[in-house]
Amino acid sequence: MRLLHTSDWHLGQTLHNYERGYEHQRFLDWLLDTLVAEQIDVLLVAGDVFDNANPSSASQKQLYVFLQQARVRLPALQLVIIAGNHDSAGRLEAPGPLLAAHGTHVIGHILRDNAGNIDLERLLLPLTGSDGAVQAWCLAVPFLRPGDVPKIASDSGQDPYLGGIALLYRQLTDLALARRQPGQAIIAMGHCHMVGGEMSNDSERRIVIGGTEMLPSGIFDAAKIGRASCRERV
């Protein structure tokens, strides 16, 4: 199975009042050609699809035209899209039922049942090969705000936010391990900063105070993340 991981498209962004739609279109055209040339089976988009929570009709059309063209050129392509901190989770997820019928899974929200338990099932997606058999399980975790994460014991000594994120990934990993068969991979997605990564003051606005949203890289064996605004080592 061949996967391509990308993020932070920021469709609809302007730079000093200059509309960047042409640049974004050139990127999407390149990405489409790359998907075909490399015969990609799964495209992972790790958040910040749009630059703001109220994207223009033009930028929304740009996304949906790309998705349609990708499916035409690669009919078996699977796509997994998670919301980032710039996205409106509800707006991104709204066409989800229609997109899912065409191989595109969109996860914007963390949902809970009446008892307050997080719906883990919708965050764990099977990825299938050309023969229809499951080859990998994807932990599709969108951008997490403090209210999204499970509560941890007050006497654990951990930061409630970071500990809650780690717990959520452990719960999802345990669920994936229970489902996986020999030879099946487990792939974790997220949209977050990592401790030690360089933050761009020019393009990334802070929305959580004090750096508490920056995750220690040690909680992951491997991370397919979005939110980095420049090349960095973590």
Model-derived regions, located:
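Extended recognition/assembly regions associated with phosphoester-bond processing machinery
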Residues: 1-45, 50-233
